[in-house]
Amino acid sequence: MKNNILISIIVPAYNVEQWIERCLDSIRNQTYRNLEIIVIDDGSTDKTPEILESYSQKEERIIVVHQENSGLAIVREKGIAMAKGDYVGFVDGDDVIESNMYERLLNNAIKYHADISHCGIKYCFYDGRVKMHWGTGDIKVFDRDTGIKELLSAEIIEPSLCNKLYKRELLYNSCLDVTIVNYEDLLRNFVLFQRAEKTIYEDFCPYQYWRRENSMSNNAELTKQF
């Protein structure tokens, strides 16, 4: 049964005291309930660690890890190593997801027998602007070669890890270089799309990527179009 499938969600968190509560609330309130929420505090110096401990006390699905500041790639590697889910997703600690995101991604992965299920991103700015691609509701299924071409063209497939649901086994040893800062998402996705026999894309935008300075994943590939 679908409800027996466990999804692990990896949340990197670094100095996100202003945003982490709304992020975790949006994950906790997912319509798909069988979640493992792994939050890795990457050496935060604000109140992020205390907030995370508070959430772990009231939500048994939340697992909190504290570590010295190591960078986004290493945080994700630790989360992948800890994950027990059949599928794995990523949410940045200052972002928000709509309540049905993982249920729809999982439904598509099952229906189309896909290794990666993904969707669009809504880019939210603190001055009130919102930008998103398309949002037509269309569904597109890609084989390996077509998926890689679409990823590199960036016309349909966003390079981010955060709008996708991956079969867990794809993710092992998928980081080319943990010292890379810019384009880490794109490079890792290039490896993952090479490993995936089939990917499924639904054109809806439930992932709210909030643009702010000093975000852990504030990479050039996510801003070039704006």
Per-segment meaning from a language model:
Residues 1-226:
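Nucleotide-sugar donor-binding/catalytic module of glycosyltransferases
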